[in-house]
Amino acid sequence: MNKHSLRARPRTLAIAVAATCAAFALAARADESAAASAEAAQAEAPAASADPSTPTVDQLSRVEVASKRSKLDEARNQLSPDTGSSVYSFSDADIAKLPLGDATPLNQVLLRAPGVVQDSFAAGGVHVRGDHGNLQYRIEGVALPDAVSGFASALDARFARQVSLLTGALPAQYGYRTAGVVDIHTKGDLDEDGGSVSVTGGSLGHREAAASLFGSSGNLSWYVVGSQLQTDEGIENPTASKKPLHDDSKQQRGLAYLSYLLDDDSQISLFAGVTNNRFQIPDVPGQSPTYTLANTPPLDSSDIDANQRERMGFQVLAFQSKIGAKTDYQIAFFNRTSDVHYLPDPVGDLTYSGVAADILRSNSAHGLQFDLTHRLNPQHTIRAGLFAQREVGYTGNASTVFPADADGNQTSTTPITIDDNSRLAGSTLGAYLQDEWKLNERTTINYGLRADRVDTVTAESQLSPRLGVVYDLAKGTRLHAGYARYFTPPPSEKIDQTSVAKFLGTTNALPSDANTAVRSERSNYYDVGVAQEIDDRWTLGVDAYWRDVRHLQDEGQFGSAFVFSAFNYSQGRIGGLELSTTYKNKSLTGYANVAVSTARARGIETGQFNFAADELAYIASHWVHLDHEETVSASTGLSWRYDATTQFSGDVLYGSGLRNGFANTTHLPSHTSVNFSVEKGFDLGGAFGKIDTRVALLNAFDRVYELRDGSGISVGAPQFGQRRSVYLTLTKNFSL
């Protein structure tokens, strides 16, 4: 196949899908609902009775609106199938049972799912099924574009009615970030007015305040939540001490969801989020400077003052409606801006690492997503969609360095400043067409085709077939299997366009030549699993997966800044096995997950300038473990509701250790963290009324463990897990 024919195919499928969508759009629309006139008639009617048990007009209106929203929510959910994939869900009740309740960071919520591996905050917090990142976040079915610092730290679990993690062989509508899809349904459909205020205080100067407000007025409903956190441990401690040095952080985030019913079949939704996070970069005492700065005394390593700021904002405007009785659709317009700014200590960074780099990475993206479902007949449901995105990224790098000889030895104590700025614009286009075929009462097949094209540092495209099968073997026993061809463009906000030539003859000279044209990852993914419902309380699950990869993407921290850059291995092999079980009754709930995985790759094919020659040579001839591979990971938890106002919870997190050493040839020791919490409600009477309290104890046995030791492929500073910490949370719920 020649190059031109490969490029033509995505356009052909896109035209076909667009034509299909247009045909549905031209169909006759169903008669408009008479809901508005009915509401007006109700508003004019006098009250029939003063009996408080008789529903008021306002209450009846709320019920009617809630019913309409429920139908629209169900229709929207049908736009996002999961046939053939693995799904692990957390309801808001499940999240409330975690040690920190709904104050649990979203990454830590996901850590309770099978196949999720813990890493440091700077590295993204978690890895799913052998991928470094490659997670897609969706709110009400709309994919959020990538952010420089990732969405996990931007989204708040308080906002979620349900969080689902989809993995495996995903249907054709899911593209680009496919290690896992974090699908979030919001609390925006509450049928009453109210809110909550909570405060949390605890170890290491942890001070957090949060508030939410929700309600409705006629056809308009809203849910708004915001929080502010201050802590003395914003990033993992690089030492084993209980209290890190220079690690303060201030984190602010807000999320809002608004929905307006236009009629029985249509609604407009707006959801938006903003974060503003500031971090001190923690210090390591007892180090000695490597370089000398003219007329400046040595700076103690515990007094280095480097900082980083991360900001992000997104907005999504979605219109949902239907055409006739068989067709539902949603079109969403989105916008996202984000930036990360590393501010070095001009003396400390320079004298200890030979470079003080003021680095700003910013990225903005906007586009649209269109999804359509047409129920052709009882056996076939056709789904189609389009995705288009335009983004612009900028990297500003003002590096102060020392002149150096060919061996990297400092030749002058007077530094020079080198500007290395770059701009990158790109676009992404995608289209899909798929059919959910109910072959019989036991068997459902979802087959489809996806076409994608990306233009950033390279122009690439791919046709991606998808196939998923679900078979009900017996009552309570369901088998699923799937195949997916994946196409993963590089995250443009993490493409490093460093100029190697500019830094020759300096203390920031790079070890090898550059290839900054990060390529799209291409993989064949196979997944098979079985779920067994023992009864209506207890379920078991087993899932196995394997992935063959070309141009495997990874990310690494190269330098002092907590900014990650993407690069490619030429080949990759990733696979694993997951076991899970859940149990739920009225007072006792529990879960347990165990996962075994392997993730290996060979041959660095882009970003070679970040690696030493001996490391490049070894990786070229050996299958090396990826730095985020953890052979065994496990989590288990138990929650017991003693009475209507008292709940006890606990969980255990285990990891066999991430990779370390030269070319990731060894791994860190295993680690276990045990966590407990007690939640108790009190009725204080008077103006205070009911108050909910929660005491949480994290890492109860104060285990000292390293997530990273600073060695390994593309690994930055050492990072230790959180030491024993105690938190007290007070929450006041109120009605309006």
Where are these regions (language model features)?
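Flexible loop and strand-edge segments within Gram-negative outer membrane beta-barrel domains
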Residues: E32, T231, L245-D247, D265-K322, ...
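Periplasmic N-terminal accessory/gating domains of Gram-negative outer-membrane beta-barrel systems
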Residues: E39-P52, T56, E64-E74, Q78-H127, ...
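Short strand-turn segments of transmembrane beta-barrel domains in outer membranes
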Residues: S153, Q162-P171, V181-S216, V224-G226, ...
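Transmembrane beta-barrel wall of Gram-negative outer-membrane proteins
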Residues: G201-Q230, S241-P282, N307-D328, L376-Q379, ...
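C-terminal beta-signal and adjacent terminal beta-strands/loops
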Residues: G234, T645, R659, K680-L736
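Surface-exposed extracellular loop regions of Gram-negative outer-membrane beta-barrel proteins
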Residues: R278-Y291, D339, V457, K475-Y525, ...
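Membrane-embedded beta-barrel scaffold of Gram-negative outer-membrane proteins
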Residues: K322, D328-Y342, D472, K494, ...
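Gram-negative outer-membrane beta-barrel transporters
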Residues: K438-N440, G541-D548, S565-N660, T731-N733
